[in-house]
């Protein structure tokens, strides 16, 4: 049986990996997952990521901790296969009053809510991270 929501699975693996104090988590790779991992690394929520394998590529995400506690406090799926959530530039949410980020899929690629606002672009709200 196929996976219904691979992005939710990715976020759950990150959440569970940090709850279990794992160094890294791995999952099947896709272009969207790699783009989300890139944004998480740029924002400082993960240490790094790598893609290995040709036939079935695996994405490995290195989790980040600060003084023994996970850096990611909140990672929550917003838009899902059964209910897509799209917002225009003026309606993009601020996560935790601007302390967190909303990851947005736009026509120019996957970016944070701040970058989307700066570029005057709306799009699909993939998830919240704080």
Curated annotation (Swiss-Prot):
Name of a matching Pfam family: Ribosomal_S8
InterPro entries, sorted: Ribosomal_uS8 (IPR000630), Ribosomal_uS8_CS (IPR047863), Ribosomal_uS8_sf (IPR035987)
Transport is among the record's keywords: no
Transmembrane segments: none
HAMAP family in UniProt: Ribosomal_uS8_B
PANTHER family the UniProt entry points to: 40S RIBOSOMAL PROTEIN S15A
Similarity remark: Belongs to the universal ribosomal protein uS8 family.
Protein name: Small ribosomal subunit protein uS8
Organism of derivation: Aeromonas hydrophila subsp. hydrophila (strain ATCC 7966 / DSM 30187 / BCRC 13018 / CCUG 14551 / JCM 1027 / KCTC 2358 / NCIMB 9240 / NCTC 8049)
Gene: rpsH
């Amino acid at each position: 049986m196929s996976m219904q929501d691979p992005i939710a699975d990715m976020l759950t693996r990150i959440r569970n990996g940090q709850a279990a104090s794992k160094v890294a988590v791995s999952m099947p790779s896709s272009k969207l997952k790699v783009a989300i991992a890139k944004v998480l690394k740029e924002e400082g929520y993960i240490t790094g990521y790598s893609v290995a394998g040709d036939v079935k590529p695996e994405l490995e995400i290195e989790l980040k901790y600060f003084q023994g506690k996970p850096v990611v406090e909140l990672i929550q799926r917003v838009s899902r296969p059964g209910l897509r959530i799209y917002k225009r530039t003026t309606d993009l949410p601020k996560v935790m009053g601007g302390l967190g980020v909303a990851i947005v899929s736009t026509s120019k690629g996957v970016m944070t809510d701040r970058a989307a606002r700066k570029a005057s672009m709306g799009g699909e709200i993939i998830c919240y991270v704080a």
